Amino acid sequence: MRNQQLPIVPLLRDELPLDTVELARFMIGKYLVRDLPEGRMSGRIVETEAYPVGDSTSHAFIGRRPYNGSLFLARGHAYVRLTYGLSYMLNMSAEAEDVGAGILFRAIEPLEGLPLMEARRPGVPLRDLARGPGRLTTALGIGQAFDGLDLCAGRDLWIGVLERGETLVGVTTRIGLSREMHRPLRFFEPGSAFVSGPRKLLLTPQPGARTRA
């Protein structure tokens, strides 16, 4: 008999802000769920980055191409891309259909299905299982086959909410970019040990930086 699952409720597309930056902020404190025949893996989203319209670092900046079409789907669809031939990155489309923008899921706090995650990342401490975008996709078993998946459908791989209410959100500049480094488009849960990146980037949250479920 399986352990009782957390009562995570799928997020509907209409609940998602129709703005890339606000969506990246909104997703802090929400949940990423991966359902498998052998059980469920889930985690609380503690870090995201926004790649809005017109951002030269976005994969959508050059316009629609065969490889980036999922960024041009209506908000709430997965865009999965292999980076530097090493790690898959899980992004989500963030605007109206045909616009082209996205957010990157950078880290989660693992909650359900820890043995399943640990099997994919053996010998790794809990804190580091999904702390960073490449680690996240490895722990959850996310690859190219998930590109274009509707994350609002509540099956296979999906986004959800557990607690309704306000969540405090910190904001800093993004990580690992060679241009547009000054923009405050990285969002995180203050105090979380599962946030990636240099500790010096974890600045005091800006006044009023709260998101509501």
Curated annotation (Swiss-Prot):
Q: Which UniProt keywords apply?
A: DNA damage, DNA repair, Hydrolase
Q: Which Pfam families match?
A: Pur_DNA_glyco
Supply the enzyme class, top level. Answer: hydrolase
According to the UniProt entry, its GO molecular function terms are: alkylbase DNA N-glycosylase activity; DNA binding
Matches recorded under SUPFAM superfamilies: FMT C-terminal domain-like
Q: What's the protein called, per UniProt?
A: Putative 3-methyladenine DNA glycosylase
Task: State which Enzyme Commission number(s) the record gives.
Answer: 3.2.2.-
Q: Which family does the similarity line name?
A: Belongs to the DNA glycosylase MPG family.
User: What GO biological process term is on the record, naming one?
Assistant: base-excision repair
Q: Does the keyword Isomerase apply?
A: no
Family annotation (InterPro entries): Formyl_transferase-like_C_sf (IPR011034), MPG (IPR003180), MPG_sf (IPR036995)
